[in-house]
Amino acid sequence: MRYVALGDLVADCYYKNVGQDKELIKIDGGSSRFNVIANLAARGNSTCVISGCGQDLVGKIVLNSLMRLNVDTSFVIRKGNIRTRAYHLTVEGNKHICTKTCPICGNRTWYNQEVVTIEYYKKHIKKDDILILDGLKPENIPIIKTFPNEKVLDIGRIKRLDGLSNTEILNILQNKNIEILQLNETVEQYLIRRFKISKLLELFQILEPKFMIVTRGKEGADFVTQNHIIHKTLIHCQKEVDDTGAGDAFFSMFIQKYYENCKRISRGWIDETFLLANDLTTRVVSHLGARGHLYDGYYLKNINNCICKED
């Protein structure tokens, strides 16, 4: 059994304000599904990414960030005619502004067409792979519908849901192979309104996952299984530097413990796993970046221009 993330790789580029200018200070791997994989790999789980990226410096950094955690990157396609996808985050205290456009040169560093095709996935996904997916992006929907593998799915944004009818949402999410479905509070409330219901338990009954997690930020999380809701309250970190990736790390712990416990869920198991997940997220938010708790990261020196123009 291995955990597998699909889709093109993404970088997180961090900047700080220097007077009226921006200064690039750090580049690391990003995107929820790959952050989940990184956390799983750091704890010794078998992991793989089937992906694509550019042959640029950013792509090299993102690949190295996974390889140093022993993630299998054998099936990553690198193309020389693209720049690796990148989010640009300007850090101000413990807050950040995120764009897909370089704040130094103004270039958009995000291509929309996937490098990797579903046919490529079919060649390399094994029947017992557990697929890590985030969001209902167009490239994820056929994977959810057609691949028989067990899947864990995190939906953190409502943007993609707006373009789907209620019937389409149900056709995607009422999938017997979705083992764990994680939503944040915004998505939960959006779906409750969409389906004209009033309670989380009704939403669980409509979507029919094996196990549902609803994260509520600093208020903690709700866990739903077998028509029961268990609420857990977070123990807060005293030193919060950056909350990027906290939800991904939290999710990774529940994924791992779910399978280690042979998919058995109990109140005691939720209590125990929540303590481990809470401790992990406390470490995540104490560092800059989603993976700062896993390794030192790539703090750049001697780069006088923006990363978009490097050769």
PLM regions: where:
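Active-site metal-binding loops of divalent metal-dependent hydrolases
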Residues: 7-9, 136, 157, 249
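Conserved N-terminal subdomain of the carbohydrate kinase-like
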Residues: 19-23, 45-130, 300-311
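Short catalytic helix/loop segments, enriched in acidic residues and glycine
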Residues: 19-38
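Hydrophobic anchor at the start of a short beta-strand
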Residues: 3, 46-47, 73, 150-151, ...
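Structural motif
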Residues: 2-4, 129-130, 180, 211
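Conserved beta-alpha-beta core of the PfkB/ribokinase-like small-molecule kinase fold
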Residues: 130-202, 220
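Positively charged, low-complexity intrinsically disordered leader regions
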Residues: 1-20
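Conserved phosphate-binding/catalytic region of the ribokinase-like
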Residues: 4, 193-311
